[in-house]
Design a protein with these regions (language model features):
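A short, exposed helix-loop element centered on a Lys and neighboring polar residues
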Residues: 87-88, 132
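C-terminal helical subdomain
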Residues: 146-149, 154, 162-214
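Conserved Rossmann-fold cofactor-binding substructure of NAD(P)-dependent oxidoreductases
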Residues: 15-43
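Catalytic loop of short-chain dehydrogenase/reductase
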Residues: 99-126, 131-139, 148-152, 158-161
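Rossmann-fold cofactor-recognition segment
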Residues: 4-18
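Active-site loop of short-chain dehydrogenase/reductase
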Residues: 45-49, 93-108, 140-143
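Conserved mid-core segment of classical short-chain dehydrogenase/reductases
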Residues: 28, 47, 57-73, 92, ...
């Protein structure tokens, strides 16, 4: 299967909110032609559009007062600003009435309070609310959801286990999950996410949990 001639690959740091915003709106962006124009070209002949916002940072893994300011800023830019900017851009660029599905990958940390995750949890809660607001706006042929994927064995988990226990009280819990085989594989989780996106249940609730389906 050959990729569309309208496909252009762009390398951009999603944690740099200013750079992403400039690329989406400004033809003078150092990343080349403006992203808004590229999106319109890419989506021009689309029969259906799917946007998945998965990129995220879990740092700072630390209680308030022990967090690095740079990590707070980076996490909010990557976890919140980037998904909102991309969702807004795709909504603006999609051809009229073409079906659009927007999936944010959320977290149980956005729905329950955990010591040491005031930044990560807050950022994931923001995506839950963004999905709710999209539903409240009643965009025609648009479905949106924020899905908590469960606890998955990824590099993010390794980063959590490497955190400072004195600053992150939950470190021991995640070390135990790894040692006791309590983590889902990335491949199994990806397959479940794909099945969820293709199901009739996608978009019926703004904040969903993959463990409620399997």
């Amino acid at each position: 299967m050959r990729p569309s001639e309208n496909l252009h690959q762009v390398s951009i740091d999603l944690a740099d909110g200013a750079a992403l915003a400039a690329w989406l709106s400004d033809t003078s962006s150092p990343h080349g032609r403006d992203g808004g124009g590229l999106l319109r070209d890419f989506l021009a002949d689309a029969g259906k559009i799917l946007l998945i916002n998965n990129a995220a940072a879990v740092s700072p893994n630390a209680v308030s007062g022990r967090q690095r300011p740079s990590e707070i800023l980076s996490a909010v830019s990557l976890n919140v600003a980037a998904p909102l900017l991309l969702a807004n851009a795709v909504l603006a660029a999609r051809p009229a009435l073409v079906p659009l599905d927007i999936l944010h990958i959320g977290s149980g940390a956005g729905r329950k309070s955990y010591a040491g995750w005031s930044v990560y949890g807050t950022s994931k809660a923001a995506l839950d609310h963004h999905a709710r607001c999209l539903a409240a706006e009643h965009h025609e042929n648009v479905r949106a959801a924020c899905l908590a994927p469960g606890v998955v064995d990824t590099d993010m988990q390794a980063q959590i286990r490497a955190s400072d226990a004195a600053a992150f009280p939950l470190k021991g819990r995640f070390v135990s999950l790894k040692n006791e085989g309590g983590l889902q594989t990335a491949a199994d989780t990806a397959a479940k996410i794909a099945a969820y996106v293709e199901s009739e249940r996608f978009g019926t609730e703004a904040a969903a949990d993959i463990r409620d389906f399997w």
